[in-house]
Swiss-Prot record:
GO CC aspect terms: cytosol
Role noted for this protein: Required for maturation of 30S ribosomal subunits.
UniProt record similarity statement: Belongs to the RimP family.
Gene: rimP
Name of the protein described by the UniProt record: Ribosome maturation factor RimP
One Pfam family cited in the UniProt record for this chain: RimP_N
Length: 145
C-alpha cells in the first residue's frame, strides 16, 4: 500500500508519514498519515484524500469495504520506520510489541535512536534494543512544557 500511495502524497508536496489498515470485521479503515514542515490543515487532508481515492478506485487494492481517513500524525504521532525512530530520538515513546521481548510486551521510556535493525529505548535506567520487526505499535508521548 505504501508503494501505491506514497508517490501520490509526495507528488502533492506532503510526506507520507505512514499507512495503517485496520480490519474491523466487514468494514475496515485505511488511515493515511501525512505531514509537512508547515503543519497539516483540514484542507490538506481533503486534497490528499481526493487524490488517493482516485488511485484506490482505479487500482482497487482492497477487496472489502473500507473507509479512507487522511490525517496528520498529531502530537502523539505513530512511528513506522527506522528513519522515523532516528528522527524522533530524544522523545518519550510508548511501544507495544507483537510478542514478548525479555519478558514484556510494553515499553515506555526515552527513545535513544536505532542500532542496526533495533530501536533503542531507555526504560527505568535499563536500555533495551527492540527488534523493529517485533514492534506492533509505537507512539510519541506528547510533552506539554
Amino acid at each position: 500500500m505504501q508503494a501505491l500511495l506514497a508517490p501520490v502524497v509526495e507528488a502533492l508536496g506532503y510526506e507520507c508519514w505512514g499507512i495503517e489498515f485496520l480490519s474491523q470485521g466487514r468494514h475496515s479503515l485505511l488511515r493515511v498519515y501525512i505531514d509537512h514542515a508547515d503543519g497539516i490543515l483540514i484542507d490538506d487532508c481533503e486534497k490528499v484524500s481526493r487524490q488517493i481515492s482516485g488511485v484506490l478506485d482505479v487500482e482497487d487494492p482492497i477487496s472489502s469495504e473500507y473507509t479512507l481517513e487522511v490525517s496528520s500524525p498529531g502530537m502523539d504521532r505513530p512511528l513506522f520506520t527506522l528513519e522515523q525512530f532516528v528522527r524522533c530520538a530524544g522523545e518519550q515513546v510508548k511501544i507495544r510489541l507483537r510478542s514478548p521481548f525479555e519478558g514484556r510486551r510494553n515499553f515506555q521510556g526515552l527513545l535513544r535512536g536505532v542500532e542496526d535493525q533495533d530501536v533503542v529505548v531507555l526504560v527505568d535506567d535499563h536500555e533495551y534494543l527492540l527488534p523493529i520487526d517485533l514492534i506492533d505499535k509505537a507512539n510519541i508521548i506528547p510533552r506539554f512544557d
